[in-house]
């Protein structure tokens, strides 16, 4: 018989830097799961991606055990890294703050494709291009 799910928690933390302090402790504390074990597993799974914000989905079961699924980095983080900027434009329609090439856009789409709801890499590229546009990043064709 399968374990009964108590709660599913989604978190986004810097890779390899999870600790029991807030926000992790605040979210996981009421569930009764061993927070330090969750932090150790997250850090072990994300240690090769230092400097990125990595989302994770933690499924907590009634017996206080858990399973963790690591996702790919958010598109906005990938775009900021490729464009060499620290944050998106406050006025994306008026001021453009960076640019990326179409090849870089394809690389991001291929990396992100397993986590996206897109039928093809080209469809994923269009979605990511829209995100770039809303951040004030231009795509050079």
From Swiss-Prot:
One matching Pfam family: Ribosomal_L11_N
Entries under InterPro entries matching the protein: Ribosomal_uL11, Ribosomal_uL11_bac-typ, Ribosomal_uL11_C, Ribosomal_uL11_C_sf, Ribosomal_uL11_N, Ribosomal_uL11_N_sf
One of the record's GO cellular component terms: cytosolic large ribosomal subunit
PTM section of the record: One or more lysine residues are methylated.
Domain of life: Bacteria
Keyword RNA-binding recorded: yes
GO biological processes: translation
Keyword rRNA processing part of the UniProt annotation: no
Keywords associated with the record: Methylation, Ribonucleoprotein, Ribosomal protein, RNA-binding, rRNA-binding
Main function: Forms part of the ribosomal stalk which helps the ribosome interact with GTP-bound translation factors.
Matching HAMAP family: Ribosomal_uL11 (MF_00736)
Subunit description: Part of the ribosomal stalk of the 50S ribosomal subunit. Interacts with L10 and the large rRNA to form the base of the stalk. L10 forms an elongated spine to which L12 dimers bind in a sequential fashion forming a multimeric L10(L12)X complex.
Similarity comment: Belongs to the universal ribosomal protein uL11 family.
Designated name of the protein: Large ribosomal subunit protein uL11B/uL11C
Species classification: Bacteria, Bacillati, Bacillota, Bacilli, Bacillales
